[in-house]
Amino acid sequence: MAVNVRDYIAENYGLFINGEFVKGSSDETIEVTNPATGETLSHITRAKDKDVDHAVEVAQEAFESWSLTSKSERAQMLRDIGDKLMAQKDKIAMIETLNNGKPIRETTAIDIPFAARHFHYFASVIETEEGTVNDIDKDTMSIVRHEPIGVVGAVVAWNFPMLLAAWKIAPAIAAGNTIVIQPSSSTPLSLLEVAKIFQEVLPKGVVNILTGKGSESGNAIFNHDGVDKLSFTGSTDVGYQVAEAAAKHLVPATLELGGKSANIILDDANLDLAVEGIQLGILFNQGEVCSAGSRLLVHEKIYDQLVPRLQEAFSNIKVGDPQDEATQMGSQTGKDQLDKIQSYIDVAKESDAQILAGGHRLTENGLDKGFFFEPTLIAVPDNHHKLAQEEIFGPVLTVIKVKDDQEAIDIANDSKYGLAGGVFSQNITRALNIAKAVRTGRIWINTYNQVPEGAPFGGYKKSGIGRETYKGALSNYQQVKNIYIDTSNALKGLY
């Protein structure tokens, strides 16, 4: 299937600052391609430090009036954004598929609708938020106010470009902040098109979108003296740098980072549910998911029954043209990611691991121009293996046999990460006990990779700081002010 790219994507994009697309301070651009075909989609402006200065200055100016708008006004604008996203769902989903390589069935059903739902959700959250008043005694009163922080600086990863942007933008502007956000230089196009919705709905300067390299303009955003709050989704290595910038400037940071999550299949699991859940955990979005269930821990009693079913299921996955509605897995997002995946396959071949399914790049039937990889299942002898400890970020699943629930818990916790995990069991008490014992921010029971609004998402340990996607995330973008009132009109007698 082929579409006319220019029906969806402009040939060039400027920076979105103060409600307009503008030229950058430099004429440098970055080529943006379709990872499934190698086709050039567009050229984006390569922002420099001067552009970051401009965007932050505009955001600071806009904050003065935006922070004073009523909650109901902000809520209505967020709802309008969500409505317009849904009205343009098919177009924006196609842009996401063209730019990211993920299947159109996912962008149409998940990425764009869930982005829209986040704007609707945080409209309701801010509209129903209430402060508190505490009567300390008959003469004194404590009022607690939640106030916006100021200018938010955000950078989001390439795996869910529009959805992750919504996770940042919706709560930030709902709380009364303004934002300067930068998408990945490889997948910026959906957010740039959605800027046209912001242009229609929001006052100028509330949302500003820069494009460029993370090591250049992204770093400049995080180290800018005019930025009051940092928010980042990406690798743990870069997360350390963002945390250092936050510490240096003494500003708060929300970090959603890497993971090596364990998906635990107990001996009483419904195997039909488990097979589907395992695939949801590692094949959804080509495995390019921070919460991917990339370590499969299988009870020894059902190991020999489950593994052949997985081998068959993996071999039947349709990998191909992301624009085809029947495609279940599309292209990896770029050559660097494909090379990284291949490097771990090489490690498996040179070690005592056993490749049970997949393990190859796909190049037949017109796939040679893209970065397609087979669903891959690898048995490793224990959790100390390199493939069981490091985040691969692709459709590569390591499987480890466990003898009981406690061993599953111990192995699940034997990781520097703590983002997510899963448990499959028909005994809810047993599943809950494991869920409580595993040190991660999210545990799914009898499903995987469901991330709706209204349920907190974020990690323990090296997987990040803070939570997103639920009402408590609003506090990430607020400061608490206490107004303490003495109505006694009486001297205290100390001086």
Swiss-Prot record:
State the Gene Ontology terms under molecular function. Answer: aldehyde dehydrogenase (NAD+) activity
- UniProt entry keywords in alphabetical sequence: NAD, Oxidoreductase
Q: Does the keyword Acetylation apply?
A: no
TM spans (from-to): none
One Pfam family matching this protein: Aldedh
Do you know which InterPro entries this protein is assigned to? Answer: Ald_DH/histidinol_DH, Ald_DH_C, Ald_DH_CS_CYS, Ald_DH_CS_GLU, Ald_DH_N, Aldehyde_DH_dom
Coiled-coil region(s): none
- EC number(s) recorded for this UniProt protein: 1.2.1.3
Residues involved in NAD(+) binding = G212, K213, G214, S215, E216, S217, G218
Protein name per UniProt? Putative aldehyde dehydrogenase AldA
Species: Staphylococcus aureus (strain bovine RF122 / ET3-1)
